[in-house]
Amino acid sequence: MEAGTEVGKLARELFGKPVDVTETVNGQLNLPAMTDRTQVEIEHETSVICEASFSYQGCYCAVDILKRENDGWAIYEVKSSTVNEKNMKAVYVADVAYQKYVLEHCGVRITGTYIVSINNDYVYDGKLDLERLFQITDVSEFVRNEIGEVEKNLLQEDTLLESENEPERELDYTVKIHMDVRIGNIVQKNYQLRPYLTYIGCR
């Protein structure tokens, strides 16, 4: 976790001076405050927002780096490992597709989706070169193919969350990811935060 946090901080430096909207209360992430602050930064035309937070019908996500473009916004998902075709398709693209799904349902136009990962060919020569340490992969085509699966997975998760029984088979990894997020939302609700967050017209 610490290594991932440090990589995330370094990756942010590729984008100048972004605004981090992370908010906490009693040591826990304050999701309503984060979504509210994200809206404020968007209205203030902030160029780059870190941990940009959105919620749509109980689905919450925080984008590692959200960068303003001429006609919309680009999602940058930071990974502390290298990217290969297998993990990109099986795990990373699913994450980004979920984020795009939530943001677009919140009225945010997404014009690009990227994964920022470690370049395993980089050799440290005594001076850190972030441009060479990281590689940025455009995953727009993969996300476009994956986006249709998001809603199907959410329907499956709704069934599982409402059931009193354990699932009969092991969950697909993508479903596990989304379940963790949505169970986290339930915990947040019990933390006396607003049960349904709203953002740019989401209900």
What label would you give each PLM region?
Residues D20-V21, G107-Y114, Q156-E168:
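Short secondary-structure capping/junction motifs at helix and strand boundaries
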Residues R37-N145:
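Mg2+/Mn2+-dependent nuclease catalytic core
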Residues T24-N26, N30, T82, K89, ...:
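Alpha-helix initiation/capping motif
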Residues K9-E13, A94-E104, G148, K152-L155, ...:
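A broad, structural surface signal
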